[in-house]
Amino acid sequence: SLSGPAARALAANGSEKAGQALVAALKRRSGSPKTQKDVIRAIADAQVKEAETVLLALQGAADPNMQKEVLYALSCVGGSNSLPVLAKAAENAGYTMEITGANEAYIALLKRLVQSDRDAVMKAAKKLQKAAAKAGQEQTREAALQILLAAEEPAKVSKMVIAAMKDPSK
């Protein structure tokens, strides 16, 4: 299939027109699932922000491999509209690694949005930290703490570090 090389060529081009072509291809939803996955991956690689709405519509795919591509792409191009969708996907995944990569995608999105949407990220990371603790997922809890430390004002970081050091699960 030539869909993979063609989609990667458009992604490598990096122009606005190339991004528009990828989004248009995804909107048409033509071709095989492999073709769609190739286009979704290219959108992620080219960081085509305009694709968020189309990707959100594709989220929830029955095919776990398609879902993985969509969630990965949302982690690369999504904005605050993607936060609740990826939060729910991470929750459904039990805040751990599994085939769709939902938890990893959510963490990656939070890390990417720290600078542009600090308040929403802080709120989401605090919620993630509590939920991960409840689920017994220490690695996700640690990732949420790293996000909080990156987002927090420097004056408050030392307090957070001291509190983390006193945590019984250290």
Q: PLM features: residue spans?
A:
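Short acidic/histidine-centered micro-motifs embedded in hydrophobic/aromatic stretches
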Residues: A25, A42, A57-L58, A73, ...
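Structural signature of alpha-helical solenoid repeat scaffolds
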Residues: A11, K27, A44, S75, ...
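Conserved hydrophobic register position within alpha-solenoid helical repeats
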Residues: A6, Q36-V39, V70, A102, ...
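Residues within HEAT/ARM-like alpha-solenoid scaffolds
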Residues: K34, N65, M97-G101, A120, ...
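Amphipathic alpha-helical scaffolding segments comprising HEAT/armadillo-like alpha-solenoid repeats
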Residues: S1-G4, S15-R29, Q36-K37, V48-G60, ...
